[in-house]
C-alpha cells in the first residue's frame, strides 16, 4: 500500500519541520502567514500568500546569515494533481528555491495562484537572476510577473503559440499537425530573428556616432553551443550584450511527463551532453529519495568513480578549448588523446562513451567488468604527468596570462547574486562544493580538496577546473583501492524484478511484475529533489509524483542557465576580444542551458 506523504501542516504539527531555525525565525516575523509542507528531501517548504511574497523573500534575503542565492525559480500546473491533501488550493504554483551558504541550508517558498488570476510580483529587485527564471515561467506556463523589466519568451520563438508546460498542451509530436518549412515560412522565421534594439531599450546611436549591432552566432553546436549574442558596440567596446538562447531547447521537462521513471534516464544524458552519468545521478537519487531506496555501498562507489571520470573528460575538453580560444591551437589535440583514454575506461565499464544511460534506480545497470582495475590504473598513471606538462606549457605562458588574467572579473557577491555555482563561484574565493558541504553517495569518505581562486577572473576559473582534474584522479584512485564487495543494485521491488521462483509459483507476483515492466513502477505521491556538484556547477532535479508510473512534474535546474544570464553584467564596458575569453572561461553547453 502506498501512502500520500505530500501534506501541509500548521507551524506546530510537524516537529521535523519546526526544528529548522529559519522556520522559527519566520514564525516570529510572519506568525500565521505561512503554511508548512512536508517533502521527502527535507528542505523546509512553506506556502505564502501573493500579498506577503515579496516581504517574505526580502526578509530571507536580508536576515542574519541570509539566503543570498536564488538557486531556482519555476512553477507547476496543479490542475490535474490528485494527491495533494492538505495543501492550499492552487491551480498553478510558483516556487522559489533559496540557498544560504553561511547556514548551508535551503528553503523553498511557494505561492498558490488561481487559473483566472495568474499574476505574481517580480523578484528581480531582490535577486537580479530572477529575470530569466521569470521569463521562462511566463514562456512555459503563461504566468505574468508584474514589474518585470522585459517579460518576453526566452526558450521558444517569440511567435510561438501556447505555453508548453501547461497540462492541456500536447506532449507528443504526433498530436500536432506535421511540421513543414516552405520558402514563405523560412523567410518568416528569418525575419523573426532580426534584432530590434528598441525592443530591448537600446539606442542606435550615441552622442557622437552610431552604434554597431553585431550578431555573434547562432554558432555551430561544437563552438560553445547553438546560441546568439547580440552586441551593441562602440568600436571594439561592448556597450551592451543580449544573450539569445533556446535554439537547443527540446522540452526535456515536458518529456518527463510522458516517460516512466526508468525510461526517462537516457534523456538525462542529453542535458549536459559532456557530463555523461553525472546527469543521471541527481535524477536517480531524487527517485530513490522518493521511493525510500537505500543504494548499496558498492553501487555508490561505482557511481562516484564513473562520475569523476566524466568530470575529467569534461574538464579536459574545457581546458583545451579555453587555450584554443585564447589563440593556442595545439593543446586541444593532445587533450582529445587524453579524453580518448578516459573514454576507453568508460566504454569498457558502461558499454558506451558519452551517453551511457548506465545508472539505474537503486544502483547501476551492471557490475564492473573483469580487468577494470588495470584500465583504471593505466589511466591514473598516465594523466598526472600530462596535466603537469599542459600547465607548464600553457597556463604559465606569459601570452595566455596576458589574455586571461584580470579579464571578465567578478567577485563573490556578484556571483552569489547571479546564482553562479561550480568553478565560477569557487574562483572568487568561495569554498563551496556540494561534495564537501552536503556529501552524497559517500563523498564524505574520500580525501580530496576543494580548489579555489581569489581573483574571480578567466584565468582563475580555468586553474580551478584544472585542479579539479587532479582531485578527481585522487578520488578515482581511492575508489579503485577501496572498492567494496556486495551487490551493485538495491534489492527493492521498485528497482529490481522479484525472484524467479516467486513469479513461477505466485500468480499475483507474476501479474505485478508484468505490470511493473510493461507500464513502469508506481512511485509514492510526494515531492523530492536532489542536487549534485556537476561538471559545470549545481545540477538538480525536483520531481513531483502523483502516485503514478510517470512524473507529474520534473524541474531541471542547470548551472549554465544562470552563468549565461550573468554575462552582460560582467562584460559590458570590455572589449570584444575579452568577451571571447569570457565565453571560453565559463564552460557552457547549450543543451544544459536550454534543456
UniProtKB/Swiss-Prot annotation:
Keyword ATP-binding (UniProt): no
EC annotation from Swiss-Prot or TrEMBL: 7.1.1.-
Q: What keywords are assigned to this protein? A: Cell inner membrane, Cell membrane, Membrane, Multifunctional enzyme, NAD, Quinone, Translocase, Transport, Ubiquinone
UniProt xrefs under SUPFAM superfamilies: HydB/Nqo4-like, Nqo5-like
Reaction catalysed by this enzyme: a quinone + NADH + 5 H(+)(in) = a quinol + NAD(+) + 4 H(+)(out)
Write down the membrane topology: Peripheral membrane protein
Keyword hit for Disulfide bond: no
Q: Which GO terms describe its cellular component?
A: NADH dehydrogenase complex; plasma membrane
Region (NADH dehydrogenase I subunit C) residue spans:
1-186
- Give the residues annotated as coiled coil: none
NADH dehydrogenase I subunit D: region residues: 210-595
Major enzyme class: translocase
The subcellular location is: Cell inner membrane
Any single GO molecular-function term of the entry would be: NAD binding
**Pfam family of the protein (one):** Complex1_30kDa
Please state which protein family the record places this protein in: In the N-terminal section; belongs to the complex I 30 kDa subunit family.
Instruction: Indicate the quaternary assembly.
Output: NDH-1 is composed of 13 different subunits. Subunits NuoB, CD, E, F, and G constitute the peripheral sector of the complex.
Biological function: NDH-1 shuttles electrons from NADH, via FMN and iron-sulfur (Fe-S) centers, to quinones in the respiratory chain. The immediate electron acceptor for the enzyme in this species is believed to be ubiquinone. Couples the redox reaction to proton translocation (for every two electrons transferred, four hydrogen ions are translocated across the cytoplasmic membrane), and thus conserves the redox energy in a proton gradient.
Q: What is this protein called?
A: NADH-quinone oxidoreductase subunit C/D
Provide the species name: Psychrobacter sp. (strain PRwf-1)
Q: Which gene encodes it?
A: nuoC
Amino acid at each position: 500500500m502506498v501512502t500520500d506523504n505530500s501534506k501541509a501542516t500548521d507551524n506546530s504539527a510537524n516537529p521535523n519541520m519546526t526544528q529548522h531555525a529559519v522556520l522559527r525565525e519566520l514564525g516570529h516575523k510572519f506568525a500565521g502567514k505561512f503554511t508548512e509542507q512536508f517533502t521527502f528531501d527535507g528542505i523546509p517548504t512553506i506556502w505564502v500568500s501573493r500579498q506577503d511574497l515579496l516581504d517574505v523573500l526580502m526578509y530571507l534575503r536580508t536576515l542574519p546569515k541570509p539566503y543570498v542565492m536564488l538557486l531556482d525559480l519555476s512553477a507547476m500546473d496543479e490542475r490535474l494533481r490528485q494527491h495533494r491533501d492538505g495543501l492550499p488550493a492552487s491551480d498553478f504554483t510558483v516556487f522559489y528555491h533559496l540557498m544560504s551558504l553561511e547556514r548551508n541550508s535551503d528553503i523553498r517558498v511557494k505561492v498558490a495562484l488561481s487559473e483566472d488570476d495568474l499574476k505574481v510580483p517580480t523578484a528581480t529587485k531582490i535577486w537580479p537572476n530572477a529575470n530569466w527564471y521569470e521569463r521562462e515561467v511566463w514562456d512555459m506556463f503563461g504566468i505574468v510577473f508584474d514589474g518585470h523589466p522585459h517579460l518576453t519568451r526566452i526558450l521558444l520563438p517569440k511567435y510561438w503559440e501556447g505555453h508548453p508546460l501547461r497540462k492541456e498542451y500536447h506532449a507528443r509530436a504526433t498530436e500536432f499537425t506535421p511540421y513543414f518549412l516552405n520558402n514563405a515560412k523560412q523567410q518568416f522565421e528569418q525575419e523573426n530573428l532580426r534584432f530590434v534594439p528598441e525592443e530591448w531599450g537600446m539606442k542606435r546611436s550615441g552622442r557622437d556616432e552610431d552604434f554597431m549591432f553585431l550578431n555573434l552566432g547562432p554558432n555551430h553546436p561544437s563552438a560553445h553551443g547553438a546560441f546568439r549574442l547580440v552586441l551593441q558596440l562602440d568600436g571594439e567596446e561592448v556597450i551592451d550584450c543580449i544573450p539569445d538562447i533556446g535554439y537547443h531547447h527540446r522540452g526535456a521537462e515536458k518529456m518527463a511527463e510522458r516517460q516512466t521513471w526508468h525510461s526517462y534516464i537516457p534523456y538525462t544524458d542529453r542535458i549536459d551532453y559532456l557530463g555523461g552519468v553525472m546527469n543521471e545521478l541527481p535524477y536517480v537519487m531524487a527517485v530513490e529519495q522518493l521511493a525510500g531506496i537505500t543504494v548499496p555501498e558498492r553501487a555508490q562507489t561505482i557511481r562516484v568513480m564513473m562520475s569523476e571520470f566524466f568530470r575529467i573528460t569534461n574538464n579536459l575538453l574545457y581546458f583545451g578549448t579555453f587555450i584554443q580560444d585564447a589563440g593556442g591551437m595545439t593543446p586541444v589535440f593532445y587533450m582529445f588523446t587524453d579524453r580518448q583514454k578516459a573514454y576507453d575506461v568508460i566504454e569498457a565499464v558502461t558499454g558506451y562513451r558519452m551517453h551511457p544511460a548506465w545508472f539505474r534506480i537503486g544502483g547501476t545497470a551492471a557490475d564492473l567488468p573483469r580487468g577494470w582495475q588495470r584500465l583504471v590504473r593505466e589511466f591514473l598513471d598516465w594523466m598526472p604527468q600530462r596535466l603537469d606538462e599542459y600547465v607548464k606549457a600553457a597556463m604559465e605562458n606569459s601570452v595566455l596570462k596576458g589574455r586571461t588574467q584580470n579579464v571578465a572579473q567578478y567577485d563573490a557577491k556578484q556571483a552569489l547574486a547571479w546564482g553562479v555555482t561550480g568553478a565560477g563561484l569557487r574562483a572568487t574565493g568561495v569554498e563551496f562544493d556540494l561534495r564537501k558541504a552536503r556529501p552524497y553517495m559517500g563523498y564524505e569518505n574520500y580525501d580530496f580538496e576543494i580548489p579555489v581562486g581569489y581573483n574571480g577572473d578567466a584565468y582563475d576559473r580555468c586553474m580551478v577546473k584544472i585542479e579539479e582534474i587532479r582531485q578527481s584522479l585522487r578520488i578515482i584512485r581511492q575508489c579503485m583501492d577501496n572498492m567494496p564487495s556486495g551487490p551493485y543494485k538495491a534489492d527493492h521491488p521498485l528497482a529490481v524484478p522479484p525472484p524467479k521462483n516467486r513469479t513461477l509459483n505466485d500468480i499475483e507476483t507474476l501479474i505485478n511484475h508484468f505490470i511493473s515492466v510493461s507500464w513502469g513502477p508506481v512511485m509514492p505521491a510526494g515531492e523530492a529533489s536532489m542536487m549534485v556538484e556537476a561538471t559545470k556547477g549545481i545540477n538538480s532535479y525536483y520531481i513531483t509524483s502523483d502516485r503514478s508510473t510517470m512524473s507529474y512534474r520534473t524541474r531541471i535546474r542547470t548551472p549554465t542557465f544562470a552563468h549565461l544570464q550573468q554575462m552582460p553584467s560582467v562584460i559590458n564596458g570590455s572589449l570584444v576580444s575579452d568577451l571571447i575569453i569570457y565565453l571560453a572561461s565559463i564552460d557552457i553547453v547549450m543543451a544544459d542551458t536550454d534543456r
